[in-house]
Amino acid sequence: MIDYERVSKFISLVLRHKPEAANLTVDKYGYAQVDELVAYLNKKYGGFTVTDLDTIVETDDKQRYSYNNDHTKIRAVQGHSFPVDLGLEAQQPPLLLFHGTSTKYLDSIMEKGIISKSRQYVHLSKDVDTAHTVGLRHGGGTVILVVNAEQMRKDGYKFFLSDNGVWLVDEVPTKYFTLYHCNTGFDLNLLKVIAGEYDDFFVHHERTEGQS
């Protein structure tokens, strides 16, 4: 029986970082040929078919992959370490966005801001829970960086929304975020309240200004 989780991790590696690991070439939009990928996976894992690939794409909890219109090509929807034209247009982000990380990275983040490192973009979450889940993956104390996306937008930064709901931006300088340690459930719930009240305040403020 094919281990879909294991295969999915390999597909992620290939489509995001190392297409040559599966003898693939990708076009400027990040797409690889489905038949070539399936042929390689069949050789590597045995008995792998297009149906198996469909299952992985459809059941992936992060929705990391997408097909082109006729399902002849496949790509990762974000997270590339090489330049890819995702065909995304700049969008207006929520007032706040969130970035989950670990305390072990804080010194670098406070010096350089949130940078993409090996990825094409910085990845930001639309809600606290998702950012917290991302932060937990790094181990150590979990920190959520609360990003003032609205101010960044006003200052000219462009935000893009990937097909799986991840917000993308080139960088986040230190002046646009604050730190919040989330070591307990209470910390996490308190941050949700604070973030919600921030949104409510600005929505109310904008409505009041519009009525004056």
For each feature predicted by the language model, list its residue ranges.
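Conserved NAD+-utilizing ADP-ribose enzyme module
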Residues: 1-97, 102-122, 126-212
